[in-house]
């Protein structure tokens, strides 16, 4: 129709959701291009995996790296005196102000002075802080990390003694107090050394030093890279490998401990690991009259060592 020849078609209103009335002229063409591969989950900021990774990284930054050469603080009068007598290369002796000077304190100060070890008198509160409020009896001795022996050194110690070897190996013992108490018992009953795994085991820390009452300065403690391999080597060398477990099929009364022997002590909770148990010549249990299911690992080790010492005296 002539009157409608110039009529405009429908025109989209500006600002509607469908966008402008005309094209972008290619300005937004990039939006049509692919965005590439989806990044891994830990690289997507809002993904739970990314949040976990960020949290772990922050915790790692906060956690101080453990120094391989950090010193230990041996606490208590007997442990300190035993370390000094054994000529452990200590760097400082701390004496709390007001400490009563008995024979052990006097001896500790005298040995330290004779060997050029720094003697520092400090407020008791300072020694409390340095020891994390552990019992120190007014004395603390700063010593380097424990110098572990080689497993072969334990056999050499027994050979030099001229007596049948009496060794103790620990399996799954993670409490340093148990380690210290066992070291003390081994020394008390004529043993020649203690063997611990290099990994997943308690180590000779200041806590173990104190619990051992200084016996760790006299008795060698060795570390084994592979406990089972070392036990097999000792068995090939003539040692009887005796496991100690509440479910053992042999009672302590039936054990012959007069020959060379290594007693393997498992933890109170886990007991002996499967491979260690398989490598034992015998697994011994301690007969008990009461309803107690098991003894603490260090107590059980002491009972067995006392029985072996009795047999060897007979």
Swiss-Prot record:
The EC designation for this entry is 2.1.1.-
Keywords, A to Z, come to: Methyltransferase, S-adenosyl-L-methionine, Transferase
Q: Which GO terms describe its biological process?
A: methylation; RNA processing
Task: State the source organism's domain of life.
Answer: Bacteria
Q: Name one GO molecular function term.
A: RNA methyltransferase activity
UniProt-listed Pfam families: SpoU_methylase, SpoU_sub_bind
Q: What is the enzyme's class at the highest EC level? A: transferase
For region Disordered, the annotated ranges are 1-73
Q: Which SUPFAM superfamilies match?
A: alpha/beta knot, L30e-like
- Put simply, this protein is called Uncharacterized tRNA/rRNA methyltransferase Mkms_4822
Organism from which the protein derives: Mycobacterium sp. (strain KMS)
């Amino acid at each position: 129709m002539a009157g409608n020849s110039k009529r405009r078609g429908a025109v989209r209103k500006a600002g509607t959701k469908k966008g402008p009335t005309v094209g972008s002229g290619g300005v937004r063409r990039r939006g049509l291009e692919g965005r590439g591969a989806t990044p891994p989950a830990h690289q997507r900021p809002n993904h739970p995996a990314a949040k976990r990774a960020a949290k772990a990284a922050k915790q790692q930054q906060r956690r101080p790296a453990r120094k391989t050469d950090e010193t230990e603080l041996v606490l208590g009068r007997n442990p300190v005196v035993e370390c000094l007598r054994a000529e452990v290369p200590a760097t400082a002796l701390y004496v709390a102000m007001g400490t009563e000077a008995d024979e052990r304190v006097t001896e500790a100060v005298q040995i330290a002075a004779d060997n050029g070890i720094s003697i520092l008198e400090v407020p008791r509160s300072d020694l409390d802080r340095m020891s994390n409020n552990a019992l120190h009896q007014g004395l603390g001795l700063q010593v380097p990390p424990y110098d572990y022996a080689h497993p072969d050194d334990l056999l050499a110690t027994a050979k030099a003694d001229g007596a049948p070897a009496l060794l103790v190996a620990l399996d799954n013992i993670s409490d340093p107090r148990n380690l210290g108490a066992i070291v003390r018992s081994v020394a008390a009953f004529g043993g020649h050394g203690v063997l611990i795994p290099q990994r997943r085991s308690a180590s000779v820390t200041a806590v173990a030093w104190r619990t051992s009452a200084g016996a760790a300065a006299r008795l060698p403690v060795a570390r084994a890279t592979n406990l089972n391999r070392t036990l097999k080597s000792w068995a090939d060398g003539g040692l009887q490998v005796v496991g100690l477990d509440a479910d053992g099929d042999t009672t302590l009364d039936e054990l012959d401990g007069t020959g060379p022997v290594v007693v393997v002590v498992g933890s109170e909770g886990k007991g002996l690991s499967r491979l260690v148990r398989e490598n034992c010549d015998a697994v011994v249990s301690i007969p008990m009259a009461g309803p107690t299911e098991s003894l603490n690992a260090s107590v059980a080790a002491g009972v067995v060592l006392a029985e072996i010492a009795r047999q060897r005296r007979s």
